[in-house]
Amino acid sequence: SVQDYVDAFLPFVKAGIPIICICITTKFSGSMQSATTARDMILEEYPKARITVIDAEINTVLQGLYVLEACRLRDLGWEYDRMVERLLAIRESGRIFFTIGNIDYLKHGGRIGKVMGIAGSALKIKPLITLKEGEIFASGIARSREKSMQKVIEMLKAYLDERTAKPGEYSFAIGYGYDYEEACHFREMLKDLVRERLGIDEIEIYQIGATIGVHTGPYPIGVGIIKRADWEA
C-alpha cells in the first residue's frame, strides 16, 4: 500500500539518505503507483528528499538480480545520479527465459491467447516464454519437460550470441517454483555453457514468489539474465 512505502521511505528521508526504489513491472502489479504516490506525499513535507522510483520492467528472480546490481554500485561508491542513470541503462538487457508445467494458469490469467491456451491444454505441450520490457511473449513449444528445459537453454544461447556476451558481463540465476531437485538438475544442464560464456562457476538458484506463481502455476523453471551495472568494457 501507499502507507507501506511511506513507512519504508521516511526513516531514510529523515536521516538524509537518498533512496532508489525498484518496483515490479507495472504490467503485473500496482506497486510502482503506490511507491510513486508515497514519494510525492513525502516530497511535500521534505522537498529536499531524493527518492527515485524505477519500474523494473522485470520481476521475480530477475528483479532480485537488478536490485543486487544497484547494491553493487552503492558498495562501489557510485554517485547517486550516476547510479540511477546506469540502472536505467541496463534495464533493457533483462530477460527471463522459462517454461511451465502447463498452460492453464497463463490462460486463466489472460496472459496468453485463448486459442493457444486451448491447443496447449489439449496437446499437453510445454510452452516456452520470454519476459522482457514488462511483457511476456510466447517463444515456442516442446512436447516434454526435458525438451522444454533444453529449449530454454537454446533461447539463452541465442540471446548471448545476439548480445555478443563476454565473460563477466552479465549477472545470471535460475528460478524455479516448487521442485528444487529439478532446479538442481537444470543447473547441471546449464553449468558448462554458463561457465564458458558468462564466466560464472557457481550458478545461484532462487525460488520465485507467489505474485508470479499465480500466473505460472507451481512448476515454472527458467533463467534470468541482466547486464552487470559496473561493466564498462
Features from the language model and the residues they span:
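Mixed-charge interfacial surface used for oligomerization/domain docking
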Residues: I20, K27, S31, A35-D40, ...
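Short acidic/histidine-rich motifs immediately flanking catalytic phosphotransfer sites
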Residues: A15-P18
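Glycine-rich oxoanion-binding loops at beta->alpha junctions
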Residues: S1-F12
